[in-house]
Amino acid sequence: MSMPKDFTFTDYKPYDFANRRHIGPSPAEMDEMLKVVGYPSLDALIDDTVPPSIRQRTPLAWGAPMTEREALDKLRETANRNRKLVSLIGQGYYGTITPPVIQRNILENPAWYTAYTPYQPEISQGRLEALLNYQTMVCDLTGLDVANASLLDEATAAAEAMAIAERVAKSKAKAFFIDENCHPQTIALLKTRAEPLGWQIVLGDPFEDLDAAGVFGAIFQYPGTYGHVRDFSGLIAKLHGQGAIAAVAADPLALALLKSPGEMGADIAIGSTQRFGVPVGYGGPHAAYMAVKDAYKRSMPGRLVGVSVDARGNRAYRLSLQTREQHIRREKATSNICTAQVLLAVMASMYAVFHGPDGIKAIAQSVHQKTVRLAMGLEKLGYTVEPDVFFDTITVEVGKLQGIILKAAVAEEVNLRKIGTTRIGISLDERSRPVTLEAVWRAFGGDFKVEEFEPDYRLPQELLRTSAYLTHPIFHMNRAESEMTRYMRRLADRDLALDRAMIPLGSCTMKLNATAEMLPITWPEFSEIHPFVPADQALGYQHLIEDLSQKLCAITGYDAISMQPNSGAQGEYAGLLAIRAYHIANGNEHRDVCLIPTSAHGTNPASAQMAGMKVVVVKVSDAGEIDMDDFRAKAEQYADTLSCCMITYPSTHGVFEENVREVCEVVHKHGGQVYLDGANMNAMVGLSRPGDIGSDVSHLNLHKTFCIPHGGGGPGMGPIGVKSHLAPFLPGHPQTDGHEGAVSAAPFGSASILPISWSYCLMMGGEGLTQATKVAILNANYVAARLKGAYDVLYKSAKGRVAHECIIDTRPLAESAGVTVDDVAKRLIDCGFHAPTMSWPVAGTLMIEPTESETKAELDRFCDAMLAIREEARAIEDGRMDKVNNPLKNAPHTVEDLVGDWDRPYSREQACFPPGAFRVDKYWSPVNRVDNVYGDRNLVCTCPPIESYAEAAE
C-alpha cells in the first residue's frame, strides 16, 4: 500500500517526561519568554546568570531518560527484590492497616500531599483542622495539656524532650537519665544529641539506678522495648522533688488500655503514631508526637495549631506561638526543627476519626489478646516468657537455640527480633492473624492452633486505664464511609495546594510531584518492609539507595552520601556533626566557631548551636552578598578556633555570588570547613557542583529539588553529601554498622519516599535535569522582567539577572499607600494564589520562586495578579480608593462577604474576581483574615466544642 503524500512520521513523544510533562513552558513559549527577558537563547541567559568560575565542566550523564512506563517497570523490578515477610520485630515499628478510604483520599490525594506548611492560615483551614484533631488525639491519649502538630520520628522527639528538660528544669545537674528499656535507636540518638552539648548520659534500670538529684531529667519507655509495663508515678514524683523533668515515650495504641503518662505525673510524653494507619516503609516517614504540661508549651519545638478568629469573628485556625521557632529565634530557638510530618499526622488523625475510641480500644484489646495467646503457647512449650505483664511485646529466653529459631521463623516467612545472644523478642500488631501465631509456634517447635488457648489479661490492674479519651464528637460522627469521604473532601476543598495553582514560595521549590513518581510509595514491597529486617530482605531498597546516592554524588561533586537525615534541618545537623567529629579526630577539639551570614536560614544558627558550636554572625552587603571584608576579618579573628562557615548558594537573596570560591578559600586557609546549604540546589543541578567550588559538605532537600512533595508541612528528606575526608564521620546507626552518631530513628531516614526522587532522576536523565535547572532560572527572570516597573527586584547580579528566585520590594507600597506585605499576600488569595515567601530574608518583601514546572500561562496569571495589586495600591495613592476600606485591607474576601450586605466603596466584582482569579473554578478562602494576636493571647490547641462545628456548617 502506498503512503499518502501528506502523511509524515513525527517525532512526537507523548511520554517524554522531562520536556512534555515536568517542564512547564513549551519551546515556543520559552522563545517568547526569552524575548521579554532580552536574550536570544536559553543558553545565553544561563551564561549571563551563572558565573563562569563555578560552571560545571562536564555534563550530567547516566544513560537515556526513561519514559514513565519504563521507570515504573524499573521500580517494580526493584521492589520485587525486597522480601515481604511478616515482621514481628517491633522496636517502635509495627504492622498496621491503612483504611483504604484514608489511603485514597489523603495519602494518594494531591490536594493533601502537594500543599505547603500552613503559614498562610486562610488557605490552610482544612489541614489545620486535621492537625487540630491530631493534637486533640495526642492530648487525650497522653493525658497532657498541649500537643504539637508532629515531629520527625520517635527518637528525634525523645531528643527534643531532653532539650526541653534541660531548658526548663530547676535542677542545675548536667546529666540525663535514659531507661535501658528505651528502644536502641532512641538511646543512640539521645547520645548523639547530648554529647556536643556537654550533657552526660546515664543509662540503666530506673528502679535501681536513677539518682533523681543527679539529673535534670529522665525518659522512660512505656511499654518498654522488651515488653515491660511499669508504673513510673513514684519515680516521677522523686524527679519533681529534685527539680528534674520526667518524659515518657509511650505507645499510643497501648494508651487505649493503660494509664496515661499525664496521670502518672509526666511533664512530657513523646512517641510515634506510626501504628495509627501509617505503613512502616523501611523506617518512615511517620509522625512522631509530643505533648507537654501547659507550663512548658512555649518551650515545645515544632508547629502548634491553635484556634483564633477571623475578621468577622468566626472561628479560624492558625499556627500559634511562632515567635519561639527557629526562623525567628535562630541560635536561641528551642530546636532546629523546621517542618515535620504533617501528611502522616493527618493520616494518623483520620485513623482515629475513622475508628473512634471504641475502635481504637478494640484494636488494642485484640493485639493484647493475641500476644497473651502467643505467650501461653510458648510457655506450654517450656520456654521462659518475660515479662509477666505486657501489652504487645514479649521476650523469650531460648539459649543456644536463638539462631535455629530465628532461621526457622524466616522459613515460616516471619521475622523475629534478635536480642543479645540468647533471647528473642516478638511484637504483635493489628495485622497479626491466627496463622501468624501458629507460624511462630512452629518456629519454636510447637504445633498448636489458636483456638486451643483462652487468653487471660496480662496487664497490671493498677495501670488499667479508667479515664476517657477521644471524647470530642469529631471522633464519633464520621463512621460511615460516605461521611468519612465527604469530611476529608470538605477539608481538602478549604486548602490551596499545587493541584489548584502554582505556589511561588521562595526557597521552597514547589515543583511538580508527578503521579508516576508517587505511585510506588504505596506498593507493599516498599511500604511494608520493617527498617530492621535482615539485609538480604531489603535488596531492592539497597539497590535504590545506592543508585540514587551515586546520582546525587554525580550531581553535587561529593564523594559520599548519607540518606539518614529525614529533614533538611537534620541534614544540617548531621553535616555539622561530621565537621565537628573531623576536627576532634585531628586533635582540634577547640575548633568550635561557626561563621554564618545574617541572611542565612534560621535553621543554620539553630543547627550550629545544637552541634555545640558558637555562632559568629557575618555581615551582608547592600547588594545581598557576603561582606567579604567582614568575612575575612572574622575568619582571621577566629582563625585558631574556626570550625566552619555555613553559606547558602545561590544566596538566600536569589543571586549567584561571584565570590563563593573566595569564601571557601578563606575558610580553608584558616583551618575551617565549608557547609553549603543545599536549599537552592534547584538553580545548580547540571550547571554547577558544590563539591567543585570548595564546599566540603551539603544537605540536599529531596522535598524541594528532587520532587518529594511537601505534604502540607512534611515529610521531607535531607541527605548529606561530603567530600572524602568527611566520609568516615557520616551518621552511624546501632542497627546497621553499630557506629555512633545516629540523627534519625531509622538507618535510611524516611526511606519509603526515596522512590520518588529516584523515579525523577530516572525519567529526567542528566540532560533533562540540566534543562529543568535552566528553565527554573528562565521562569524566575521572566517573572522579574514582567514585574519590572511595578516592583523593584531587590537583588540582581552585576548583569541584572536573578537565579531561580527573586525578591521584590513591597515596602514602598507601605510608605505611599499604607499597604503592607501582608495585605499583598492576602489579596493574592482572592486571585487564587498562595503568596510568595513573606518578609524573608528581608522584612517587607516577597521572595518568588516559580520553579521549572509552571507554564507560561500560569506565570502570566500570577504576574497579572501582582500588577493588578500594584494598580489597586496606586488607586489608594491617588485618592481613588479609601486607605482603610479597600480590597487590599479587606482581603481575602469570602462567599459570606459576597452574599451579605455590601456597604464597601468598591464593587463585589472587584473584591472577588480580580485579575488572575478564575470565574468558574475560583478558589474561595473559607475565612476572612485571621487574627494572629487573638490566637496567641487566647491559646486553644485542641478541638473546639461541637457547637462551633455546627455554626461553621450553617
UniProtKB/Swiss-Prot annotation:
Entry EC no(s): 1.4.4.2
InterPro entries xref list: GcvP (IPR003437), GDC-P_C (IPR049316), GDC-P_N (IPR049315), GDC_P (IPR020581), PyrdxlP-dep_Trfase (IPR015424), PyrdxlP-dep_Trfase_major (IPR015421), PyrdxlP-dep_Trfase_small (IPR015422)
Main enzyme class: oxidoreductase
Presence of keyword NADP: no
Top-level taxon: Bacteria
One GO cellular component term: cytosol
Modified residues (N6-(pyridoxal phosphate)lysine): 704
Keywords in alphabetical order: Oxidoreductase, Pyridoxal phosphate
MF (Gene Ontology): glycine binding; glycine dehydrogenase (decarboxylating) activity; pyridoxal phosphate binding
GO biological process: glycine decarboxylation via glycine cleavage system
Cofactor: pyridoxal 5'-phosphate
Catalytic function, reaction form: N(6)-[(R)-lipoyl]-L-lysyl-[glycine-cleavage complex H protein] + glycine + H(+) = N(6)-[(R)-S(8)-aminomethyldihydrolipoyl]-L-lysyl-[glycine-cleavage complex H protein] + CO2
Gene3D superfamilies according to UniProt: Aspartate Aminotransferase, domain 1, Type I PLP-dependent aspartate aminotransferase-like (Major domain)
CDD domains the UniProt entry points to: GDC-P
Family as reported in the entry's similarity comment: Belongs to the GcvP family.
Function, in words: The glycine cleavage system catalyzes the degradation of glycine. The P protein binds the alpha-amino group of glycine through its pyridoxal phosphate cofactor; CO(2) is released and the remaining methylamine moiety is then transferred to the lipoamide cofactor of the H protein.
Self-association and partners: The glycine cleavage system is composed of four proteins: P, T, L and H.
Protein name listed in UniProt: Glycine dehydrogenase (decarboxylating)
Organism of derivation: Rhizobium meliloti (strain 1021) (Ensifer meliloti)
